[in-house]
Amino acid sequence: MISPDAARNVVGIIGNVISFGLFLSPVPTFWRICKRKDVEQFKADPYLATLLNCMLWVFYGIPIVHPNSILVVTINGIGLIVEGTYLFIFFLYSPNKKRLRMLAVLGVELVFMLAVILGVLLSAHTHKKRSMIVGILCVFFGSIMYFSPLTIMGKVIKTKSVEYMPFFLSLVCFLNGVCWTAYALIRFDIYVTIPNGLGAIFGAIQLILYACYYRTTPKKTKAAKDVEMPSVISGPGAAATASGGSVVSVTVER
């Protein structure tokens, strides 16, 4: 019989694979940016927010804060590398005004993380206290990111069209939320359960909306397809966050 820890590891590995796919969902956007050597109207905000989210989860999962959470560390460590690459590309092809804003936000995030790390390690001396402090921060920022798709879902209902909410991404989002919720329930972790439970719920709602409005969606023109880009959610738009929970939508930038 499989032990709970073994089952948890298997589910966590599956979650890592799914979340990694979600982290890669903005690749077409950045391929377009590289080809045109211009960020056009795209914003770095979602990627900056996802970077902060990943940093918090990496800190949460290290042994001195929350033992036995290495799979949380691995996927969010990968997320840091992926998001850092996106931001480097964005910085490379941005005008000076956007570059300065990016650097300012990055600076604030790094100062915030330094304050969190020092505050937690110096003031909390047990795993329980450290997990609680960092976990609450992870839940707060992670949950905010999951409310972003509400704008897209509202648009689907209003237009009776799922043009901006692809089925495959909605399905993967749902599976990702379910997978990480299961991971958190096997060895109960409230801080991983809450944001990923929300991810599973929002993913399910997206699938229901897709089923309701798929037939009323007009066929897209080639021009519409050319400008449709997946992007990372962290604010209004579309996103992938991981603890590994993720919610992904597609927005159009013109």
From Swiss-Prot:
What's an example GO cellular component term for this entry?
Answer: membrane
Q: Which residues lie on this side of the membrane: Extracellular?
A: 1-9, 67-69, 123-131, 187-189
A GO molecular function term, named singly, is: sugar transmembrane transporter activity
GO annotation terms (biological process): carbohydrate transport
The job of this chain, per UniProt, is described as: Mediates both low-affinity uptake and efflux of sugar across the plasma membrane.
Q: What is stated as this protein's family in its record?
A: Belongs to the SWEET sugar transporter family.
Transmembrane portions of the chain: 10-30, 46-66, 70-90, 102-122, 132-152, 166-186, 190-210
Location (main, coarse): membrane
- Pfam families assigned to the protein according to its UniProt record, in alphabetical order: MtN3_slv
Q: Assembly and interactions?
A: Forms homooligomers and/or heterooligomers.
Q: How does it sit in the membrane?
A: Multi-pass membrane protein
Keyword terms, alphabetized: Cell membrane, Membrane, Repeat, Sugar transport, Transmembrane, Transmembrane helix, Transport
The compartments listed are: Cell membrane
Say if the entry is tagged with keyword Cell membrane. yes
Which InterPro entries has this protein been placed in? SWEET, SWEET_rpt
Cytoplasmic-facing ranges? 31-45, 91-101, 153-165, 211-254
Which residues does the UniProt record annotate as the domain MtN3/slv? 10-98, 133-216
- The identity of this protein, by name, is Bidirectional sugar transporter SWEET6b
